[in-house]
Amino acid sequence: SSAARAVTGVDIHPEARIGRRVFIDHATGVVIGQTAEVGNDVVIFHGVTLGGVAMTPGKRHPTVGDHVMIGAGAKVLGPITVGTGVKIGANAVVVKDVPCGNVAIGVPARLLPKPEKDTRDRDLIVDPNYFFDEPALYI
C-alpha cells in the first residue's frame, strides 16, 4: 500500500508471492512486482527491482528460487527464473534465466564459472560469511 511504502521505502505488490525467511536488508528502494515469486531463505539488498518488461496479461515478473542473494541495486526483469543458490551481484541487470548455483554479474548480467563451494549446508544462511566470499559481486 502507499502508506507502507511511505514508511518503509519498499514497494511489494500485494499479489507477489514471498517465501519464508526472506530478508530485505536496508530495504529502501526495493520493488517487487505483481507476478513475482520469491522463494525461501532469500536475501535482497537495497535498491533491488524484481520487475516486468511488458504490461501483457499473465506472468510478467521473475521467479526467484530458494537460497538466493540479490545484491544492492540489481534489476531482475521479465518472466525469467533465477534458480536455487544463485548469487546476483550489485547493480547487475538480469534479463535471462540464471541456472541453479550460478553467480550473475554485470550489465547485462553474465554468468561466472560455478564457485567451488560445498552446497550441502545451504540452510546455514545465518553464517555472516555465507554470501560474502565472491569478490566479483562487489565490483
Feature annotation, model-predicted:
Residues 8, 13-14, 19-20, 25-34, ...:
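Left-handed beta-helix
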Residues 58-77, 81, 107-139:
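C-terminal segments of enzyme domains that contribute to small-molecule binding surfaces
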Residues 1-7:
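A transmembrane-helix-recognition feature enriched in membrane-embedded lipid enzymes
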